[in-house]
């Protein structure tokens, strides 16, 4: 069941989203060669708690950290570790969530570590742009898969693959609510978008095939062919005057 949010609930989510967006902005500056993913996790947890919010990932389904840190061919759900050191030329996707006043914010970014290849930079750019292509369709009266199709069409125009095994989702009091928000599919399908829907829209894109697999830790998802992957996500409210991105602080 899709849970429609009232204006008060959306304001709570706006506040939670601001903390998530600012956390990611802080982490982008901190993500440099020589830093470990555990360092980033500690910074994120401290930052979120400073604003009296709760890191929503920590303990979720047994996940051991406050952020997901996925490097290069890792797509999502990478576990921070003191043994994972960032190196010049890496790319890292950081997924972050926070709870404030009982409501969630969820977002992800992919960062460059020092100087990166042209291919990696293009992948990050296209993944981010595909999110905004999807958001253009996140308007009242459209169907859910209008978002999905717009993302897929844009990504595939560059020859990249759109991950299909993992999708975006509704969000509110719970991190994962209905509906699922695929990043692929035919337009004009799924529920009609209405005022008060809040969605986590999150294209996951790789340079090669869209096929992925899960590593032996049962969390980290990687590309099957070892190609680079990127992830970009925001929490988006569907409002009468158009979509509002709740986790974007630029």
UniProtKB/Swiss-Prot annotation:
<comment type="function">
    <text>Removes the N-terminal methionine from nascent proteins. The N-terminal methionine is often cleaved when the second residue in the primary sequence is small and uncharged (Met-Ala-, Cys, Gly, Pro, Ser, Thr, or Val). Requires deformylation of the N(alpha)-formylated initiator methionine before it can be hydrolyzed.</text>
</comment>
<feature type="binding site">
    <location>
        <position position="233"/>
    </location>
    <ligand>
        <name>a divalent metal cation 1</name>
    </ligand>
</feature>
<protein>
    <recommendedName>
        <fullName>Methionine aminopeptidase</fullName>
        <ecNumber>3.4.11.18</ecNumber>
    </recommendedName>
</protein>
<dbReference type="Pfam" id="PF00557">
    <property type="entry name" value="Peptidase_M24"/>
</dbReference>
<dbReference type="InterPro" id="IPR000994">
    <property type="entry name" value="Pept_M24"/>
</dbReference>
<keyword id="KW-0031">Aminopeptidase</keyword>
<dbReference type="GO" id="GO:0006508">
    <property type="term" value="P:proteolysis"/>
</dbReference>
<feature type="binding site">
    <location>
        <position position="77"/>
    </location>
    <ligand>
        <name>substrate</name>
    </ligand>
</feature>
<dbReference type="InterPro" id="IPR001714">
    <property type="entry name" value="Pept_M24_MAP"/>
</dbReference>
<dbReference type="GO" id="GO:0005829">
    <property type="term" value="C:cytosol"/>
</dbReference>
<feature type="binding site">
    <location>
        <position position="95"/>
    </location>
    <ligand>
        <name>a divalent metal cation 1</name>
    </ligand>
</feature>
<dbReference type="GO" id="GO:0004239">
    <property type="term" value="F:initiator methionyl aminopeptidase activity"/>
</dbReference>
<feature type="binding site">
    <location>
        <position position="233"/>
    </location>
    <ligand>
        <name>a divalent metal cation 2</name>
    </ligand>
</feature>
<keyword id="KW-0479">Metal-binding</keyword>
<feature type="binding site">
    <location>
        <position position="176"/>
    </location>
    <ligand>
        <name>substrate</name>
    </ligand>
</feature>
<dbReference type="InterPro" id="IPR036005">
    <property type="entry name" value="Creatinase/aminopeptidase-like"/>
</dbReference>
<feature type="binding site">
    <location>
        <position position="106"/>
    </location>
    <ligand>
        <name>a divalent metal cation 1</name>
    </ligand>
</feature>
<feature type="binding site">
    <location>
        <position position="106"/>
    </location>
    <ligand>
        <name>a divalent metal cation 2</name>
    </ligand>
</feature>
<comment type="similarity">
    <text>Belongs to the peptidase M24A family. Methionine aminopeptidase type 1 subfamily.</text>
</comment>
<dbReference type="GO" id="GO:0070006">
    <property type="term" value="F:metalloaminopeptidase activity"/>
</dbReference>
<comment type="subunit">
    <text>Monomer.</text>
</comment>
<feature type="binding site">
    <location>
        <position position="202"/>
    </location>
    <ligand>
        <name>a divalent metal cation 2</name>
    </ligand>
</feature>
<keyword id="KW-0378">Hydrolase</keyword>
<feature type="binding site">
    <location>
        <position position="169"/>
    </location>
    <ligand>
        <name>a divalent metal cation 2</name>
    </ligand>
</feature>
<keyword id="KW-0645">Protease</keyword>
<dbReference type="InterPro" id="IPR002467">
    <property type="entry name" value="Pept_M24A_MAP1"/>
</dbReference>
<dbReference type="GO" id="GO:0046872">
    <property type="term" value="F:metal ion binding"/>
</dbReference>
